[in-house]
């Protein structure tokens, strides 16, 4: 149905290491977020790598904001959320929007964000056995090169942990588990935002795997996490 200009919107950038999934494939995650927050969710069906590099992919997400602006929405009406690679994409897109002089979304929610595709971070080594599927040499590395040339892996639009957050960034909730190869990514992104004086919350759950919030919705940890998402959305979007 057509969106009313009074609606509050969640734009969702899905995970899949930039090379897998689609908006249709992740519909259950989008429905979960919508049901738990009461927001209308737009899942971005961005072009996958290698058919699209980061320059085009970030522009595709930004085009959704531009289209909503034509329909009367402002950035204050929108929360941007993403999981895994989609979490890194959401943060990278936000930095790019800021640098382009665009209004940034009211808030971000990042689930297990792949925020540094350059294999920098302690837990790429220390937690590699916790999630053996996500090995850098076999899965993440080839996906990273499909999405961005090696020289661009530390570009803030690609790996937002390298962003200059002193220039501004929306309130950001980062959630993940202790059994994730990307745990160092979460911590470094949080530290960068916190040290720059931005509003940020790091919410980590003992023993939880990658993107547990929507994939283990019946768990006590997921229920606790989504309650904090509701509070975050209420504080930074719905109370405006």
Go through each PLM region and give its residues.
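Alpha/beta-hydrolase superfamily serine-hydrolase fold, recognizing
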Residues: 2-240
């Amino acid at each position: 149905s057509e969106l009313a200009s009074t609606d509050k919107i969640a734009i969702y950038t899905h995970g899949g290491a930039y090379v897998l999934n689609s908006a249709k494939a992740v519909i259950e995650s989008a429905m979960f977020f919508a049901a738990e927050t009461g927001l209308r969710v737009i899942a971005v069906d961005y072009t996958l790598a290698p058919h699209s590099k980061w320059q085009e992919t970030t522009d595709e997400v930004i085009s959704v904001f531009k289209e909503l602006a034509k329909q009367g929405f402002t950035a204050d009406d929108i929360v941007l959320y993403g999981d895994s690679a989609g979490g890194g994409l959401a943060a990278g897109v936000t930095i790019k929007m800021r640098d382009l002089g665009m209004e940034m979304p009211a808030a971000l929610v990042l689930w297990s964000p792949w925020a540094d595709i350059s294999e920098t971070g302690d837990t790429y080594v220390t937690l590699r056995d916790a999630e053996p599927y996500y090995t850098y040499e076999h899965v993440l590395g080839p996906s990273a090169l499909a999405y961005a040339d090696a020289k661009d892996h530390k570009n803030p639009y690609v790996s937002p942990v390298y962003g200059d957050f002193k220039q501004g960034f929306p309130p950001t909730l980062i959630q993940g588990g202790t059994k994730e190869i990307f745990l160092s990514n979460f911590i470094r992104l949080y530290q960068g935002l916190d040290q720059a004086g931005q509003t940020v919350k790091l919410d980590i759950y003992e023993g939880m795997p990658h993107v547990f919030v929507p994939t283990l919705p019946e768990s006590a940890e997921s229920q606790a996490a989504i309650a904090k998402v509701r509070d975050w959305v209420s504080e930074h979007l719905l109370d405006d």
